[in-house]
């Protein structure tokens, strides 16, 4: 029974297609209105302003911006001097902050220094503020304040876990 319905539906579709093709209205081509099509194309362009002739004329008249390589090299050298680790050593020479930060730099002594700081109640933001005094100091000791912040977070999580275990055991 279902097969008959399928055959009837296919025959109806095919007869509709055949009559549509035979109809003379469908064989005529419509004229293209050029003004409307350009408006439609401009709607879909992402950057109409770049294709505008007036803007390109202004860019051509202005010309390329000349780059002064000597000034650029001088600025790059100045920037490298600003973040030089030797400058950080010179700035912190003879301070207790330098000895503490130098002790926290190697991986082996880092946890002992962090535990001492945490026991003293040092906040990670205070270490961050002390290190961010100068770009050279920040570059050299960035790992210290980042690792100390992570150390404090993990120590706080461990402390909370112990408190929760203690509550559940009581």
From Swiss-Prot:
Residues 1-22 form the signal peptide. It holds the Pfam family RXLR. The keyword Secreted applies. Keywords: Host nucleus, Secreted, Signal. One of its GO terms (cellular component) is host cell nucleus. A motif (Nuclear localization signal) lies at residues 157-167. It comes from the Eukaryota. It is found in: Secreted; Host nucleus. Induction: Expression is induced early during infection of P.infestans. A motif (RxLR-dEER) lies at residues 43-59. The keyword Signal applies. Effector that enhances P.infestans colonization of Nicotiana benthamiana leaves, which suggests that PITG_22798 contributes to P.infestans infection. Triggers cell death in Nicotiana benthamiana. PITG_22798-triggered cell death is dependent on SGT1-mediated signaling but not HSP90, and is suppressed by the P.infestans avirulence effector 3b (AVR3b). Belongs to the RxLR effector family. The nuclear localization signal is required for the localization into the host nucleus and the ability to induce host cell death. The RxLR-dEER motif acts to carry the protein into the host cell cytoplasm through binding to cell surface phosphatidylinositol-3-phosphate. This is RxLR effector protein PITG_22798. It comes from Phytophthora infestans (strain T30-4).
């Amino acid at each position: 029974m279902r097969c008959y319905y399928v055959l009837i539906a296919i025959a109806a579709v095919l007869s509709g297609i055949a009559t549509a093709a035979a109809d003379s209205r469908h064989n005529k081509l419509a004229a293209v209105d050029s003004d409307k099509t350009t408006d439609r194309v401009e709607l879909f362009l992402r950057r109409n302003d770049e294709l505008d002739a007036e803007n390109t004329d202004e860019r051509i008249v202005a010309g390329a911006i000349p780059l002064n390589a000597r000034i650029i090299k001088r600025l790059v050298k100045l920037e490298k001097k600003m973040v030089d680790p030797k400058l950080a050593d010179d700035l912190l020479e003879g301070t207790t902050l330098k000895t503490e930060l130098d002790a926290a730099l190697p991986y082996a002594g880092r946890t002992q220094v962090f535990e001492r700081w945490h026991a003293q109640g040092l906040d990670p933001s205070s270490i961050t503020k002390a290190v961010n005094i100068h770009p050279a100091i920040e570059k050299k000791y960035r790992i210290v304040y980042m690792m100390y912040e992570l150390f404090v977070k993990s120590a706080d999580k461990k402390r909370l876990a112990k408190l929760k275990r203690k509550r559940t055991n009581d």
